[in-house]
Amino acid sequence: MGDDELAEIRRQRMMQMQQQQMAEQDQIQRQQQMQAQIQSVLMQVMEPEARERLNTIRLTKPEFAASVEQQIVSLAQSGRLRQKITDEQLRQLLTQIVPQKKEFNIRRVG
């Protein structure tokens, strides 16, 4: 391999890395825009106390909070929300979504 071939390979590799970096930046930007849109909808359809509760949930269970957010956004977009969601309504929604845990008591007999 000559110097020209090595320079061409380096140039192609550099272009490939730049394209990959640009694609990653575009994806991050799209995710940020989508998150901003979701937050905007949530601010419109939720009372501050309910948003605070959802943010607290997000700290401990981010996937669950994202699922709840998606459900609230879909309710808002379908027009099924007549008023802002209060903290009490959010708690009711959460109890419906969270699967009920079964408790087992193991006792030794004898």
Curated annotation (Swiss-Prot):
One of its GO terms (molecular function) is DNA binding. Keywords: DNA-binding. The keyword DNA-binding applies. Disulfide bonds: none annotated. GO terms for cellular component: cytosol. The keyword Aminoacyl-tRNA synthetase does not apply. Belongs to the PDCD5 family. This is DNA-binding protein Mlab_1482.
